[in-house]
Amino acid sequence: MALAVNFKTYVDQACRAAEEFVNIYYETMDKRRHALVRLYLDKATLIWNGNVVTGLEALANFFEMLPSSEFQINMLDCQPVHEQATQCQTTVLVVTSGVVKFDGNKQHFFNQNFLLTAQSTPNSTVWKIASDCFRFQDWASI
């Protein structure tokens, strides 16, 4: 029974970290995009609608070329990733979906998945993005 309680605590901690991360990520994306790369690991990979971007410099260039955005998150889910699958690195899978407008234009539905890893600093633990997959979910006209 103690194992189940410990896992529940682990899940609760992961969800709190995910909620905090999502608030920071989308506020930074909308209002301070130049600072967004600080949330990524040095060798992080972004897949944006099938286009692969790897490394901080490439990420900074990619985010700089995107038009201004207004994200609204409608759904958030998270779960810890078992440490056997991540070489004992504390990792959380975060899944979001919602709507976004770029340059105030047409609203698009989107889905975004993040793999966050815990990075220890002398004073705290910081979550960094190892992998990020963004995809529009718009349906074609039927």
From Swiss-Prot:
Keywords: Cytoplasm, mRNA transport, Nucleus, Protein transport, Transport. One of its GO terms (biological process) is protein transport. It is found in: Nucleus; Cytoplasm. InterPro entries: NTF2 (IPR045875), NTF2-like_dom_sf (IPR032710), NTF2_dom (IPR002075), Nuclear_transport_factor_2_euk (IPR018222). It comes from the Eukaryota. Residues 17-136 form the NTF2 domain. GO terms for cellular component: cytoplasm; cytosol; nuclear RNA export factor complex; nucleoplasm; nucleus; perinuclear region of cytoplasm. Coiled coil: none annotated. Associates with NXF1, NXF2, NXF3 and NXF5. Regulator of protein export for NES-containing proteins. Also plays a role in mRNA nuclear export. PANTHER family: NUCLEAR TRANSPORT FACTOR 2. This is NTF2-related export protein 2. The lineage of its organism: Eukaryota, Metazoa, Chordata, Craniata, Vertebrata.
